[in-house]
């Protein structure tokens, strides 16, 4: 128990006087730049330049000078910004955007200071997204069962605030956060509590992602601690974001034996060591153990969610499957462990017999139906895969259209380059060429066939995405190593933009 208490101990020196005064002070700029923050983080939100910190500060000053912000406890719409609804929504959204920018500052400073001192960053998981696939390729071959987990959204807004409350000890900033969240609910009274999280996700990406990441870290905290205890090589890449005030009080509701002997918990999960990986709201837990061990993990996670988040985890959100006959739908791939059998005839003296060898292979398949659905969602084709002219791009130059479609083809080809059956990705890349030809022919008022006959080699060269062209820049074609790489699968780990098949809706 003492080791667990040390594990969840946190340096609280920077938790006080957190951010609320900074919103109204000029020295926020000096505070940010003196600590080496990236300028782009502060000045603008990605993809939308109207939510700058300067605009938010001027807006707050203007609101207080003109007395726009009036709070009334007797008003039917409590804590609402008075005025026209459209203007209120704009004010609220801009302030929350500025709030989200400022609330990231201390955590960015923590990351930058850790990197500057060249220490292991314990409170940030810096693992590359695309390193997940080589990890699965190496580990799943030796495991038996897998537990598919869908991390639930918090059932109530207050849970989001409480998740942040045990990191931030500035009460005024937390009250301001509550004001923003309930302001959204009051101004949109027709939205049910179940729809509010989805509404926040679409309305204010930055603030929602910040709060949701804290929610996920809280969900993983005790789980990661138990995994570390069962490993001989302890992991230091995760930080423990445990609710430290009421945890021991809630622990007795899980299983009574937990409060009597904390070592019993560790014994349940000590061997064999489970492998855990997550992307966004979906995670998998794989183990070499038995089905009984996986059921223990399942009910442990259900109890933890009930007592720690007051959330009932529906059984349908946790699936236990055997890897030998189950495919994982993860990050846009259908992955499975395939058994390959080979029969060898052996003869000793006058006796001959057959020996059957069974080997495991990590198999990744490109799901063609979801891939077509993803292209249809982007208005490149219909649900049946028939090409549609991208009319909104017809105002662009031909070179810009070719560049955009070429980038789409390269992303699809590179993202699925590690697939063991890449025929579907090649077909999707070829279909993207037809989509491009349809768009260009519509722009020039000609047929697709005539357009292809006119361009021919230039058009195909723009979409040349064979991996041999990339490898030829790295290795000579006559080397034995390169010949092996040409025949094998290649994972491109430097892709920044992942298409929406990999994203959880």
Curated annotation (Swiss-Prot):
GO BP term, pick one: mRNA processing
Keywords associated with the record: Chloroplast, mRNA processing, Plastid, RNA-binding, tRNA processing
Broad class of where this protein is predominantly found: plastid
InterPro entries (alphabetical): Domain_X, Maturase_MatK, Maturase_MatK_N
GO-annotated molecular function: RNA binding
One Gene Ontology cellular component: chloroplast
Compartments where located: Plastid, Chloroplast
Highest taxon in the source lineage: Eukaryota
Pfam families: Intron_maturas2 (PF01348), MatK_N (PF01824)
PANTHER family: MATURASE K
Function according to Swiss-Prot or TrEMBL: Usually encoded in the trnK tRNA gene intron. Probably assists in splicing its own and other chloroplast group II introns.
HAMAP family in the record: MatK
Family: Belongs to the intron maturase 2 family. MatK subfamily.
Protein name: Maturase K
Lineage: Eukaryota, Viridiplantae, Streptophyta, Embryophyta, Tracheophyta
Gene: matK
